[in-house]
């Protein structure tokens, strides 16, 4: 999804409260975060059945600081128990190796309590 579609994702999550809905790429991907994106992501995250993948966010122009800002926003809105790692492989391989994606994500999420982010959330949702 793109930022302008996040309101629709929030509405979908509201209409189907018993269904876990997972948003890829924080609804942003390689785009730049702005007020429209943050408002839509916030509205989506307010639904208890809303989850997000921290994936597809690396680009040749996104800095470690920019990725860390996205991680802080995602953790604030979803907490680690509704947020999960995603490599975006094989698409990410066009610009970054898998090891680079993991390393950049670890730098962006240095928080000690990220077990849910790396494994718990995906295990709960997908078994």
State each model region's role.
Residues 25, 52, 88, 114, ...:
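Divalent metal-coordination and catalytic microenvironments
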Residues 72-73, 77-84, 93-127:
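Mid-to-C-terminal alpha-helical segments outside catalytic/metal-binding sites
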Residues 37-42, 66-67, 89, 100-102, ...:
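Tryptophan-centric aromatic hotspots in well-structured domains and transmembrane helices
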Residues 1-84:
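Catalytic pocket-lining loop regions of alpha/beta-barrel enzymes
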């Amino acid at each position: 999804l793109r930022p302008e579609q996040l309101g629709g994702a929030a509405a979908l999550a509201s209409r189907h409260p018993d269904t876990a809905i997972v948003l890829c790429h924080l609804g942003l991907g390689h785009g730049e975060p702005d007020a429209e994106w943050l408002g839509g992501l916030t509205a989506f995250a307010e639904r208890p059945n809303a989850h997000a993948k921290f994936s597809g966010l690396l680009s040749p122009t996104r800095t470690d600081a920019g990725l860390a800002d996205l991680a802080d926003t995602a953790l604030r809105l979803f907490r680690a128990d509704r947020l999960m790692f995603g490599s975006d492989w094989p698409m990410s391989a066009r610009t970054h190796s898998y090891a680079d994606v993991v390393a950049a994500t670890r730098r962006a999420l240095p928080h000690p309590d990220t077990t849910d982010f790396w494994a718990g959330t995906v295990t709960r949702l997908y078994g």
